[in-house]
């Protein structure tokens, strides 16, 4: 089956909205644990209201003059672009052969949409891979250069002393986490968190590498014995902290940090609305097409206050 450039271009135009949403759908493994903010074009100020108000014994003269403040943080989304040459026949053949094997009777419009969906989902997969370690580089060429990931933002805040042990939003591990000490180490980490973060009845997520999670499972088995372990093979919460759930992610496998926070504090910014974002197919050479995409993407912590976030800096020999 041959798909013409015109058919691909028509599908791109017809399904533009769905295709622009596809990179986000392709990131669900990670962003299901975060909060997606749509309609963010370049920047939006986020943050929280701070201050206090206290009810005391009745007084006609007492006035509380302490101010209420908004601690603002900026969620930046960066406009990214890609122009990818590809041979439509090779992609179509792969999709069509797979459909035939599954007994699907696909029409040309279905194949065209699947070609575009395949390429667009790849964009989302690469953004997901670098959601922690990406570092903005204006002259870069990859997803890792497009925006500042959560680990990059964390390192910048540590460098600015806005995340620190003295403030209470940083915990520094004194030794490596292994299968022999993971339970005690991670419990100590959670115990160091503000009680307003871990003891306020809200659901909290512990973002970590799969290696750390596996070490915890092994140590948990050795610590509690075979019977309890076998009845709950996948220990998904931290012992003693039933509201703290492990979130082991492949894209955090080389991360120097763990993050203890809530889903609402992890912001992922996209636009998906403006004219700047588009997905088109153009033909400039015989047998070769160009897939052209532009879209916004960025991440940010809504707050780095200790009541919302505790960063665990892993031991580095």
Please report, for each region that a protein language model flagged, where it lies by residue.
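Alpha-helical scaffold segments that mediate packing/assembly in large oligomeric complexes
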Residues: 97-188, 317
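Sequence/fold signature of self-assembling virion shell proteins
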Residues: 2-52, 148-176, 202, 210-317
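Short helix/loop capping segments that flank catalytic or ligand/cofactor-binding pockets
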Residues: 94, 128, 215-217
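Short, basic/hydrophobic alpha-helical segments
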Residues: 189-198, 202
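Well-ordered, non-membrane alpha-helical segments in soluble/globular domains
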Residues: 179-192, 226-232
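Assembly/oligomerization interface modules of large self-assembling protein complexes
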Residues: 17-97
